Curated annotation (Swiss-Prot):
Keyword Cell membrane: no
Record-stated family: Belongs to the ArsC family.
Annotated source species: Neisseria gonorrhoeae
Protein's recorded name: Putative arsenate reductase
GO MF term set: arsenate reductase (glutaredoxin) activity
Length: 102
């Protein structure tokens, strides 16, 4: 298993560019197609903590129609509620997310 993990959507140009950049630099990475194998709530919490974000919105597609349809723009929602929404609707996960040793 690689020390680098990238949460990847092959249909996303930015995600494809990130994978290409890693390959060009000879960096082996485990590509997780998160729409096919979505992270569960526990893994999302781990990702959130590793990213060091103040708000889970930093790892969400906040401009996506689904985000607004689900009322996730409500400022009263806490990080747990937002992470549960990503677990239930993995398309809300902003990509790419690259995790590994610094």
């Amino acid at each position: 298993m690689s020390e680098i993990k990238i949460f990847h959507n092959p249909r996303c140009s930015k995600s494809r560019a990130a994978v290409s950049l890693l390959e060009e630099r000879g960096i082996a990475a485990e590509a997780v197609k998160y729409l096919d194998t979505p992270p569960d709530l526990s893994e999302l919490k781990d990702i959130f903590n590793k990213l060091g974000l103040e708000s889970a919105r930093g790892m969400m597609r906040v401009k996506d129609d689904l985000y607004k349809e689900l009322g996730l723009d409500n400022p009263d929602l806490d990080n747990d509620a937002l992470l549960r929404a990503i677990a239930d609707h993995p398309a809300l996960l902003e990509r790419p997310i690259v995790l590994g040793k610094r």
